[in-house]
Amino acid sequence: MTSARLSIIPEFLEKISLLGYDNIFSVNKSEVVNLKNKSDILFRGIKTSAGNQTASLKSLTGVSNWVLDEAEELIDENIFDTIDLSIREKNIQNRIILVLNPVTKDNWIYERFFEGKGIEAGFNGVKDNVCYIHSTYLDNKENLSESFLERVEAIKHNNYKKYAQKLLGQWLDRAEGVVFESWSIGEFNPDDLQTSCGMDFGF
């Protein structure tokens, strides 16, 4: 759980401090305890290459909210379903929260929650018991450095497709590099160089 200790937990501590709730929570490297109502926030990793971690997550009891950070990196939809079905506390609202940066449209999250439900990129609202919240750097410009915003403008000017995906949260039609881009038609072999031909059968 190195990633949680280095990124998620420090950010959580920062936010509870801003809210003035430092005395309400007890924090260690893998767990946050609310001292008032005794509820826990647990931090766990998902190992997609081995079943042990998923099995241990499935066996967790009393969990009513599950937040999957960097959800686009979870390749196996079956792992999501396994844990999703374990969030089933009675007489309480259960929530599954996916936090992600959109990647390509062949990702199962896009196919299941966007294409499958007729949801356009950038949608904010509720459909079929799913709440969509789309945010970008534009919602937080007042907290971003001038140097960062200058880099963003450079990307926007030089590579709008990258800007749209990385910074506006749009889904890519295909993986980068699959097909050449920014090409033009010109004279073939103007320097009369030796020509060789080959064929890629695609496997």
Q: Where are the regions a protein language model picked out?
A:
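Conserved SF1/SF2 helicase motif Ia
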Residues: 1-4, 92-93
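Inter-Walker segment of RecA-like/P-loop motor cores
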Residues: 4-64
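Short, conserved catalytic or adaptor-binding loops enriched in Gly and charged residues
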Residues: 32-36, 120-128, 186-189
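A generic beta-sheet turn/junction motif
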Residues: 36, 201-203
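Hydrophobic "anchor" residues on beta-strands that sit immediately upstream
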Residues: 65-66, 97, 196
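ASCE P-loop NTPase helicase motor core
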Residues: 73-143, 147-156
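ATPase catalytic-site recognition across NTP-hydrolyzing enzymes
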Residues: 140-201
